[in-house]
């Protein structure tokens, strides 16, 4: 395996601390996507975002100043 591959089972906390304050994409188990600035993530993967946009079926549905996403709904977090 190459260095840094996901199969190594690395702790994601270093990655998450690096991208705090940066634009991210958060996809939920339901397929809804949130894009915004990552403000914080806790050990349960609860996520706080600022300047958040909600996309449903690829289309912008709503914009929020701040949004909180409960961790058990999160499929993935991606740095933009």
Swiss-Prot record:
The entry's keywords: Cytoplasm, mRNA processing, mRNA splicing, Nucleus, Ribonucleoprotein, RNA-binding, rRNA processing, Spliceosome, tRNA processing
Keyword Acetylation set for record: no
The keyword Ribonucleoprotein belongs to this UniProt entry's keyword annotation: yes
Compartment list: Cytoplasm; Nucleus
Subunit structure: Component of the heptameric LSM1-LSM7 complex, which consists of LSM1, LSM2, LSM3, LSM4, LSM5, LSM6 and LSM7. Component of the heptameric LSM2-LSM8 complex, which consists of LSM2, LSM3, LSM4, LSM5, LSM6, LSM7 and LSM8. The LSm subunits form a seven-membered ring structure with a doughnut shape.
Alphabetical list of PANTHER family matching this protein: SMALL NUCLEAR RIBONUCLEOPROTEIN F SNRNP-F, U6 SNRNA-ASSOCIATED SM-LIKE PROTEIN LSM6
GO cellular component annotations of the record: nucleolus; P-body; sno(s)RNA-containing ribonucleoprotein complex; spliceosomal complex; U4/U6 x U5 tri-snRNP complex; U6 snRNP
Entries under CDD domains matching the protein: LSm6
Protein name: U6 snRNA-associated Sm-like protein LSm6
One example of a Gene Ontology biological process annotation: tRNA processing
Record-linked InterPro entries: Lsm6/sSmF, LSM_dom_sf, Sm, Sm_dom_euk/arc
Family: Belongs to the snRNP Sm proteins family. SmF/LSm6 subfamily.
Provenance organism: Ajellomyces capsulatus (strain NAm1 / WU24) (Darling's disease fungus)
Sm domain sequence ranges: 11-80
One GO MF term: RNA binding
PROSITE patterns linked to this entry: SM (PS52002)
SMART domains: Sm (SM00651)
Described function: Component of LSm protein complexes, which are involved in RNA processing and may function in a chaperone-like manner, facilitating the efficient association of RNA processing factors with their substrates. Component of the cytoplasmic LSM1-LSM7 complex, which is thought to be involved in mRNA degradation by activating the decapping step in the 5'-to-3' mRNA decay pathway. Component of the nuclear LSM2-LSM8 complex, which is involved in splicing of nuclear mRNAs.
Positions of disulphide bridges: none
Domain of life, source organism: Eukaryota
A Pfam family that the UniProt record links to this protein: LSM
């Amino acid at each position: 395996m190459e260095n840094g591959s996901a199969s190594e089972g690395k702790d994601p906390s270093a990655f998450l601390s690096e991208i705090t304050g940066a634009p991210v994409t958060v996809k939920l188990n339901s397929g809804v996507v949130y894009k915004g600035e990552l403000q914080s993530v806790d050990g349960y993967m609860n996520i706080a975002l600022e300047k958040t946009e909600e996309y449903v079926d690829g289309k912008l549905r709503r914009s929020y100043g701040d949004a909180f996403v409960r961790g058990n709904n999160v499929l993935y977090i991606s740095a933009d």
